[in-house]
């Protein structure tokens, strides 16, 4: 049941991971159904021998639920042979096997970087059998997200504001769009 979620920031990967935890709990695949979110900083320590313990602690807290590792590719930095990220991956692979009956691991990140992560350890790629890509939202979808978030907060988006936001979206370069953050960017736009 381990999964790989790929896509840009703000496309719903964490939100879907939370929903998967609830669904798997209701279906009886998981005993507790909690979602433990972490990233490289939650798994990698600064000194030899500390990383394996840190990974073990995080995995133990996720037993019965889902361990969601955001930006998992950061564990497999190329050209960093003395980096402890590879130790974290090695430990994770072993623990995924040891606890395969009551732990789901979901790793998430950018598509290209996730390929590098999955091929960084011979046993890693075979542990994941479900791959879900989260495409960027269209401008129309982003506008709907803006309006939905505004409504939740008791606001209505005026036609003038819609025009300004749509103009902002259509005027973005590809690089700016990558940094914008999709739904997260719309939430931030509303808060401004």
Where are these regions (language model features)?
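Walker A/P-loop
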Residues: 1-33, 57-60, 128
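Hydrophobic positions in the central parallel beta-sheet of the AAA+
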Residues: 3, 36-38, 67-68, 105
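Conserved RecA-like P-loop NTPase ATPase core
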Residues: 14, 38, 55, 70, ...
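Canonical AAA+ ATPase core
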Residues: 18, 73-80, 89-135, 140-143, ...
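Conserved C-terminal "switch" segment of AAA+ ATPases
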Residues: 27-32, 116-119, 134-179
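Short glycine-rich substrate-engagement loop in P-loop NTPases that contacts/grips substrate
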Residues: 31-62
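Conserved P-loop NTPase "ATPase switch" module shared by AAA+ and STAND
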Residues: 39, 62-82
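The conserved phosphate-sensing helix
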Residues: 173-192
């Amino acid at each position: 049941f381990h999964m790989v979620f790929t896509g840009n920031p703000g496309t719903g990967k964490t939100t879907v991971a939370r929903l998967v935890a609830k669904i798997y709990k209701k279906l009886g695949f998981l005993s507790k159904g909690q979602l433990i979110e972490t990233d490289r900083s939650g798994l990698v320590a600064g000194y030899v021998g500390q990383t394996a313990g840190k990974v073990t602690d995080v995995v133990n807290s996720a037993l019965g639920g889902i361990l969601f590792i955001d930006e998992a590719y950061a564990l497999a930095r190329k050209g960093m042979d003395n980096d402890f990220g590879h130790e974290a991956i090695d430990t994770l692979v072993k623990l995924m096997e040891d606890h395969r009956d009551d732990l789901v691991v979901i790793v998430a990140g950018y598509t290209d970087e996730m390929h590098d992560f999955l091929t960084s350890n011979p046993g890693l790629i075979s542990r994941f059998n479900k791959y879900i890509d989260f495409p960027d939202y269209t401008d129309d979808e982003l506008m709907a997200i803006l309006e939905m978030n505004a409504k939740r907060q008791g606001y209505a988006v005026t036609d003038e504001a819609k025009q300004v936001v749509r103009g902002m979206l259509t005027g973005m370069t590809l690089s700016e769009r990558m940094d914008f953050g999709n739904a997260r960017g719309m939430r931030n736009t509303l808060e401004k």
